[in-house]
């Protein structure tokens, strides 16, 4: 009975590895670059008006940032946005 449990555990871990390993290697998770750049523009919660740039899936687009909150798809310049999000 002990060997059956060990074999079951090894089989389970092997299947888990085979299922999750490709996801870990995919571009969607490569150093967070794609995930951040896929976020929508988010103005944030305040009423200030700062010109910022976000990546819209194709290029960087200007938007008005309220000054607080929002998400990480927010860059001070178009150049910074493209450097972070444009595909090589």
UniProtKB/Swiss-Prot annotation:
Record propeptide residues: 28-33
One Pfam family matching this protein: Kunitz_BPTI
Site entry: Reactive bond for trypsin: 47-48
Gene Ontology terms: biological process: envenomation resulting in negative regulation of voltage-gated potassium channel activity in another organism
Domain BPTI/Kunitz inhibitor positions: 37-85
GO molecular function: potassium channel regulator activity; serine-type endopeptidase inhibitor activity; toxin activity
Signal peptide positions (record): 1-27
Tissue specificity note: Expressed by the venom gland.
Primary location class: secreted
Family: Belongs to the venom Kunitz-type family. 01 (intermediate) subfamily.
Function: Serine protease inhibitor that inhibits trypsin at a molar ratio of 1:1.
Protein name: Kunitz-type U15-theraphotoxin-Hhn1n
Species for this entry: Cyriopagopus hainanus
